[in-house]
From Swiss-Prot:
EC number(s) given by UniProt: 3.5.1.18
Annotated protein name in UniProt: Succinyl-diaminopimelate desuccinylase
Organism the protein comes from: Shewanella sp. (strain MR-4)
Pfam families: M20_dimer, Peptidase_M20
Keyword Hydrolase: yes
Superkingdom assignment: Bacteria
Subunit structure: Homodimer.
Catalytic activity entry: N-succinyl-(2S,6S)-2,6-diaminopimelate + H2O = (2S,6S)-2,6-diaminopimelate + succinate
Record: residues binding Zn(2+) 2: D105, E140, H354
Annotated TM spans: none
Family: Belongs to the peptidase M20A family. DapE subfamily.
Pathway connected to this protein: Amino-acid biosynthesis; L-lysine biosynthesis via DAP pathway; LL-2,6-diaminopimelate from (S)-tetrahydrodipicolinate (succinylase route): step 3/3
Length: 381
C-alpha cells in the first residue's frame, strides 16, 4: 500500500475541493475556489444565493452557441466514520485511488472541467460561442433552491443554453464506458387509505385500512405500465414506504400511509400514470387521499453535436466506444432539458458513490479532463 503524493493538476484541485466538507446544502467555499480559477481566464462570475443554497453561474463569452458544464459542490453525509479507512474530508491517495467524500460524486468532475477549460482557453483564447458553468450546492438535498432556480433566472432573461454536459458519475466499470444521454421521468405518490380505528377483538366495530388496501397494492405492484422503447426501459413502479398502526398488537389502525414512485419512459406521461392509479383506487372502492410530487420529465439527447463530440472524445482518449444509456436515477439535467438544451452526463466510475470509502482512480481524473477538453474543441472550434 502506498500513500504517495500526486502532482496532477486535476488531482490536486479535487483534493482541495474534498477538503471542504460541503455536506448538502453547504458549499464551504468550493464555488469561491472554482470562481477564482475561472475569473482568472476571463469568466464573468455571477453568484446566485437562494435561501440556504449557494449557486454560481459563470460565463465566458457573449455569443452562442453556449456550452454549459453543470455540476454540484454539495455531497451526501459521510455516514459511519468508523467504517472509513481514512477521514472522509481528508483526501488521501492509496494505491492509485483518491479517497474522500465527493471524490467521484462529483468533485473530481468539477476539478476535471476546470482544468480542461483552463487548457482549452489557453489554446483557444478567441474561441467562438460561450462556455458556462452552472454549479449548485443543492443537488444531493431537496433540489428546491439550486439548479431549478438558476434555470428560472436564466429563462427570465432569455439566456439560453445550447449544450449541457453534467458531470455526474456516469461510468460503470471504466471511465467513459457509459454516458447518460437521457433520464426517465420521476413521479412520487403519497397515499393515505382511511379506515376506522378499533380493538382487534371487535373487528366489526372497526374498518382495517391495511386489509382494504392490500388487494389494491397487489394489483398496483403487478400492473404493466408500458413496454418501454429503444431508448428507455419499461416504466417501473416501486413501493418505497408503508406505515400503519400504533405499534400495539391489539389496535386496528385508522389509516395506512403508502409512498410509491414511478420511473417512467416516454411511452407514458405523468398525467396518464396519475389517471390509471386513481382509477385503480376507485375500482377498489377505497376511501383515500393522495398527493403527487412531480420530480422531473423524461428527456433524451439523440444523435447530434453533443453526443457526437462526446463519443469522439471518449474514443480518442480511452480507445474504446461509449454506450449511451438512460438508466439510473435522476440528475439536475432534468431541470435543464425542458429549456431546449441538449443534455448529456459524463463523469467517473460510480461504484463507490454515496458509500463509505468513496474513491476515484487518479488516472481517471486526468483522462476525464482530457475528454472534457476534446469535447470543448469539438463543439467550439
Amino acid at each position: 500500500m502506498t500513500h504517495a503524493s500526486n502532482s496532477h493538476p486535476v488531482t490536486e484541485l479535487t483534493k482541495e475541493l474534498i477538503a471542504r466538507p460541503s455536506v448538502t446544502p453547504l458549499d464551504e467555499g468550493c464555488q469561491t475556489l472554482m470562481a477564482e480559477r475561472l475569473a482568472a481566464i476571463g469568466f464573468n462570475i455571477e453568484p446566485m444565493v437562494f435561501e440556504d443554497t449557494t449557486n454560481m453561474w459563470a460565463r465566458r463569452g457573449n455569443e452562442g452557441p453556449v456550452f454549459c458544464f453543470a455540476g454540484h459542490t454539495d455531497v451526501v453525509p459521510a455516514g459511519d466514520l468508523s467504517r472509513w479507512h481514512t477521514p472522509p474530508f481528508e483526501p488521501t491517495i492509496i494505491d492509485g485511488y483518491l479517497y474522500g467524500r465527493g471524490a467521484a460524486d462529483m468533485k473530481g468532475s468539477l476539478a476535471a472541467m476546470i482544468v480542461a477549460t483552463e487548457r482549452f482557453v489557453a489554446k483557444h483564447p478567441n474561441h467562438p460561442g460561450s462556455i458556462a458553468f452552472l454549479i449548485t450546492s443543492d443537488e444531493e438535498g431537496p433540489f428546491i433552491n439550486g439548479t431549478t432556480r438558476v434555470i428560472d433566472t436564466l429563462e427570465a432573461r432569455n439566456e439560453k443554453i445550447t449544450w449541457a454536459l453534467v458531470g455526474e458519475p456516469s461510468s460503470t466499470l471504466k471511465l467513459g464506458d457509459v454516458v447518460k444521454n437521457g433520464r426517465r421521468g420521476s413521479l412520487t405518490a403519497n397515499l393515505t387509505v382511511k379506515g376506522i380505528q378499533g380493538h382487534v377483538a371487535y373487528p366489526h366495530l372497526a374498518d382495517n385500512p391495511i386489509h382494504k388496501a392490500a388487494p389494491f397494492l397487489a394489483e398496483l405492484s403487478q400492473t404493466h405500465w408500458d413496454n418501454g422503447n429503444e431508448f428507455f426501459p419499461p416504466t417501473s413502479m416501486q413501493i418505497a414506504n408503508i406505515n400503519g398502526g400504533t405499534g400495539a398488537s391489539n389496535v386496528i389502525p385508522g389509516t395506512l400511509e403508502v409512498m410509491f414512485n414511478f420511473r417512467y419512459s416516454t411511452e407514458v406521461t405523468a398525467e396518464i400514470l396519475i389517471e390509471r392509479v386513481e382509477a385503480l383506487l376507485t375500482a377498489h372502492e377505497l376511501d383515500y387521499d393522495i398527493s403527487w410530487t412531480f420530480n422531473g420529465l423524461p428527456f433524451l439527447t439523440g444523435e447530434g453535436p453533443l453526443l457526437d463530440a462526446t463519443r469522439h472524445a471518449i474514443r480518442q482518449i480511452t480507445g474504446y466506444d461509449t454506450d449511451p444509456q438512460t438508466t439510473g436515477g435522476t440528475s439536475d439535467g432534468r431541470f435543464i432539458a425542458p429549456t431546449g438544451a441538449k443534455v448529456l452526463e459524463l463523469g467517473p466510475v460510480n461504484a463507490t458513490i454515496h458509500k463509505v470509502n468513496e474513491c476515484v482512480k487518479i488516472d481517471d481524473l486526468e483522462q476525464l479532463a482530457l475528454c472534457y477538453e476534446v469535447i470543448l474543441e469539438q463543439l467550439l472550434c
